[in-house]
Regions:
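Low-complexity, intrinsically disordered/propeptide-like segments
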Residues: 17, 23, 217, 232, ...
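Surface-exposed loop/turn and secondary-structure junction residues enriched for glycine/proline
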Residues: 98, 464, 469, 513, ...
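C-terminal outer-membrane/trafficking sorting elements
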Residues: 877-891, 895-969
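Sequence-pattern detector for short linear motifs
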Residues: 10, 101, 156, 966-967
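Bacterial Sec-dependent N-terminal signal peptides
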Residues: 1-32, 124, 873, 880-885, ...
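Serine/proline-rich low-complexity intrinsically disordered segments, especially terminal tails, linkers
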Residues: 11, 126, 285, 334, ...
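Beta-propeller blade termini and top-face loops
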Residues: 23-870
């Protein structure tokens, strides 16, 4: 018998076999810039929060429901039934998320604090150059403001009504806080006032749910809340227990103002200004019923106020209208009695949009303002970008505006770059200020220059808000970092583990804007990434990058398509035994039966082989099976549809896309907006969840290999679409498919204000059509907080181990499929991670991968995490019971220098031999090609291994064999 090597080309047709190809990146892929302006991002994210979090009936998150979940989280303790997951922070350490609060310690200017709206409180001891998490328990408290009293105490406010939808309904997005807490050092904190201090019992009160701004004068604290301005002085014990509302409709009116107080500012002499709707109230001292100066700002909906630090008579306001566009900016020289307008809305200047006079405004979302400490007539205003104003004339006061930052192009090569969306500004001195943005913390140290420059200060400020997660089977050999990727809110799609990156925990932004669903191919070095409104691209290590639509989708998505959240899912395999594709090979030698023909797949030139069963002559053209297969599903490019391509991983041709689901699907028409999708391990089924509660199964994908058999508009289409569940209009936020049995799936739901969030199904591939939940069993029990569950994963080694990503972190069970529904026992699994929202969880289920069994989590506020707690000797040894020991012979055992392996395989394929130490670490690996069905023999050198016990795992096609090995030297 001979081995022969030939080059092949793809032909649509028949059968395939495999050889392993590594995921290799020679250099970072090309960056794909943001496609649309930040205004679409801000409005879109609030739509997404509402879809996932708000109650499906009321359209709001009732604070009482939020607090019920939070109170349960605060009382929970680790259960003895928990899996004991230990989470490791992965970064990215160079990407900051939305930041609305920064404080410089007045007693130590190098000590700083910064607050993320979903990632918690961070501190720095070196002026912002390096950050650390203060306490992970505070990760999901929507930190909105920080202040410091004269005696040095530091207080943090939570919840922000700027985290709203365009209609101004903060409750719809779930950006609820818990009042005010004091940080007391060493990670400790004490709740001072609000639901955090006194948990309500299903109260409908929303007092202290949103603290928009804290200001201190002396030791008095002013709090701008959703129920008005609140003021408190410390008692003799230093407690802030007596809060009062000092503002009345007028000084002669007994009715207090209890509407949303957007901002408060205190002058150097104690004068106080507070902003409500379209009004500014001013008091000489902040005492009860002293806010007698009332100024109305025409057309205003949101107002910020700021006194000049060097002159208490000078007060500025910046106001936006109900559309988020500039209403006006004014300056007062008499403590708010009168104002001169220094910027009028409706003109060519509007810091809250990139297109003045054309809309696209977002002042309802991003507004910031600060006066230079040493110059009362020099002002910074932040919207999408930063602007500076300085006075050029008096009586009336007027001045000049200058844009001093640029949100694009981004990166260190642009000295004026500051991430889009400005939320907070604080001066350190007359020339230095810090900025809180959608991209974390920035600083300028030359603000008096004509053209100030800026730097990012996000090292270890790991507050990126991820929506999605893509994992690979590759670990960078240079730095040991797993190659993963994820889509973020306003920080694009970030890739970790690439070579030539400055720090192993740094991310590389492969595309800008808001990144959503993403995936990494196993059979090629291709990354798939998305942006809002149906923007889908792929990138390869060769530097190739771009969209890959056919003519139909190019037309549909020319100006954007689909909803804000772009939903995709990718599947591939090295070995699809029933493949219908083939490679055409021209022989350059005679071939006899039993000869091995080596050739290449049409995907990534992956080496394949075929054992000849008949004779061929030199020059013959034959078709050999292409076992390497891939599928990419793309949801919603046209409303109520799902498309699929089988050439996504092949850069050599423009992929063809087929409509695999839509109104013409049978037996059930597909409808709704898909928000999650999962393939079965064999790629034969695609499970789809929609925003209105439907779960669909699209089946027979294995036999759909061209447009005639795949496209539902074809009379020859072989696909079926079955709605197997309907969950009362709630968002299907995630689906998990058992990697060992696609009949087992878990469906999880969003939306506060409900009781049940997790369901299982044990006949998912055959479940009949249903307009209810009859195919599912509810497995939510009392131990699981009543909050949105965003994703689930079924452990590859034990279907009973189900891991959930929720609005309050990770939970898991160990009896998910064997226990009666109500007895499924959930327990918190947050060690190393905290209470941060987890939007996606994925496990590496490829048994040969170096990260096999590792679970990854994409958090919405703390970046990526991973755990190998379920990987190790227990899981490896457990596999021994899953195979016939007689199928694997290992000798000699104990061994010294060489081991011989004999297996009984059920197919022609290659084998991968892995040796693990007793810690579960992979210490040696080898692959053996050209193995025939039946008895196969291999030898492997082990003389470099230290004496001790090991586990040998052999992966042969779909079979896995495991044996213990003892090395004795």
């Amino acid at each position: 018998m001979k081995n022969m090597y030939f080059k092949g080309s793809i032909v649509a047709g028949i059968g395939v076999a495999i050889a392993l190809s590594g995921f290799q990146w020679g250099s970072a892929p090309k960056y794909k810039p943001r496609k649309t302006d930040p205004a679409q991002s801000a409005e879109g994210v609030m739509w997404w929060y509402k879809t996932m979090k708000a109650n499906q009936i009321t359209g709001e998150v009732d604070p009482a429901d939020y607090y019920q979940a939070w109170n349960q989280v605060r009382k929970e303790k680790n259960s003895n039934k928990s899996l004991g997951l230990q989470w490791e922070e992965m970064g990215p350490w160079n990407v900051g998320g939305r930041t609305r609060a920064i404080l410089i310690d007045k007693n130590n200017p190098n000590r700083m604090y910064a607050g993320s709206v979903t990632g918690g409180l961070f501190y720095s001891n070196d002026g912002g150059n390096t950050w650390n998490i203060y306490n992970a328990e505070l990760n999901n408290t929507c930190i909105s403001t920080i202040c410091q009293t004269s005696n040095g105490r530091i207080f943090v406010g939570t919840g922000s009504t700027a985290e709203v939808n365009l209609a101004g309904n903060a409750n719809s997005t779930g950006s609820v806080g818990g009042g005010i807490f004091e940080i007391t050092g060493n990670g400790n904190f004490t709740w001072i006032v609000g639901p955090g201090a006194t948990p309500p019992n299903n109260s409908t009160s929303v007092d202290w749910a949103f603290v928009n701004k804290l200001e201190a004068y002396g030791n008095r604290i002013y709090a701008a809340t959703n129920k008005g301005l609140r003021v408190a002085d410390p008692d003799n014990n230093g407690n802030y227990s007596n809060w009062f509302n000092p503002i009345y409709v007028s000084c002669t009116n007994s009715f207090q103002v209890t509407s949303d107080c957007k901002d408060v500012s205190v002058a150097s002499d104690g004068t106080v200004a507070a902003a409500f709707g379209n009004k500014i109230y001013v008091s000489p001292n902040g005492n009860d019923n002293t806010f007698c100066t009332i100024y109305t700002v025409s057309g205003a909906s949101r107002i910020l106020v700021e006194f000049a630090p060097s002159d208490p008579n000078v007060l500025y306001y910046s106001a936006t209208n109900t559309s988020g566009c500039l209403a006006s900016i004014g300056i007062s020289l008499d403590k708010g009695n009168t104002f001169d307008i220094i910027a009028q809305g409706g003109g060519s200047f509007d810091p809250y949009t990139l297109t003045p006079t054309q809309g696209g405004c977002q002042g309802w979302y991003d507004m910031s303002m600060a006066v230079y400490p040493n110059d009362p007539f020099k002002l910074l205003v932040g919207g999408i970008e930063l602007f500076r104003w300085y006075k050029t004339q008096s009586n009336p006061v007027f001045g000049q505006w200058q844009k001093i930052s640029s949100w694009t192009p981004q990166g260190n090569f642009n000295p004026y770059y500051v991430h889009a969306d400005q939320h907070f500004i604080v001066f350190k001195d007359n020339n230095t200020a810090y900025f809180g943005t959608d991209g974390g913390v920035f600083r300028s140290s030359n603000l008096n220059d004509l053209n100030p420059t800026f730097v990012s200060l996000n090292f270890r400020y790991a507050t990126a808000q991820f929506y999605s997660l893509g994992i690979s089977s590759y670990i960078n050999s240079n730095n040991g970092v797993d190659v993963i990727m994820g889509g973020t809110q306003d920080n694009g799609t970030q890739v970790m583990g690439l070579p030539n990156v400055f720090h192993p925990k740094y991310g590389f932004e492969i595309s800008g804007g808001d990144g959503f669903d993403c995936d990494i191919a196993t059979v090629s070095d291709v990354l798939f990434h998305t942006v809002y409104f149906g923007s889908l691209s792929r990138s390869s290590s060769s530097g190739a990058s771009g969209t890959f639509f056919d003519s139909e989708l190019s037309t549909a998505c020319q100006n954007g398509c689909g909803p804000f959240y772009t939903c995709i899912r990718y599947w591939d395999t090295y070995y699809a035994p029933n493949t219908k594709d083939s490679v055409q090979v021209v022989l350059s030698n005679n071939v006899n039966p039993g000869d091995t023909i080596y050739y290449e797949s049409s995907t990534n030139d992956i080496p394949l082989y075929f054992v000849a069963t008949q004779s061929y002559n030199n020059g013959d053209t034959i078709k050999l099976p292409d076992y390497v297969q891939n599928k990419l599903a793309f949801a919603n490019p046209i409303a109520g549809t799902i498309y699929l391509t089988r050439q996504a991983a092949n850069f050599d041709k423009n992929p063809e896309w087929d409509r695999i689901a839509g109104s013409q699907s049978i037996p059930d028409a597909f409808s709704g907006t898909a928000v999650c999708m999962e393939f079965s391990k064999d790629g034969n089924h695609l499970f789809v969840g929609t925003s209105n509660g439907s779960v669909y199964r699209i089946s027979n994908l294995m036999n759909a290999y061209d447009s005639a058999t795949s496209d539902i508009r074809s009379s020859s289409c072989v696909l079926t679409c079955t709605r197997i569940g309907l969950f009362s209009g709630r968002a299907i936020s995630g689906i998990a498919v058992d990697p060992n049995n696609p009949d087992n799936i878990v469906v999880v739901l969003g939306n506060y204000g409900n009781t049940n969030y997790v369901y299982r199904c044990i006949n998912a591939t055959s479940a009949p059509s249903s307009n209810n939940t009859s195919n599912f069993v509810n497995i939510t029990n009392a131990n699981l907080p009543k909050c949105p569950v965003y994703d689930a994963e079924i452990d590859m080694n034990d279907k009973n181990r189900i891991i959930l990503g929720t609005d309050w972190g990770v939970y898991a069970c160990s009896n998910g499929f064997t226990a009666v529904g109500p007895l499924v026992d959930w327990a918190p699994e947050k060690t190393g991670m905290g209470n941060v929202p987890v939007y996606e969880i994925r496990q590496q289920t490829l048994p040969w991968a170096p990260n096999a069994g590792v679970i990854y989590a994409a958090t919405h506020g703390r970046g990526f995490f991973k755990t190998g707690s379920l990987v190790g000797i227990k899981e490896i040894e457990k596999n021994i019971t899953n195979v016939e020991i007689s199928q694997l012979n290992l000798f000699p055992n104990p061994a010294n220098d060489v081991i011989n392996i004999k297996i009984e395989g059920n197919q022609n394929s290659m084998a991968i031999v892995q040796i693990y130490d007793l810690k579960g670490a992979l210490v040696k690996e080898a692959s053996f090609n050209g193995l025939s069905k039946g008895i196969a023999r291999m030898s492997m050198n082990v003389n470099e291994l230290r004496s001790g016990s090991y586990i040998v795992k052999v992966v042969n096609g779909e079979q896995t064999f495991t044996r213990k090995l003892l090395i004795q030297h």
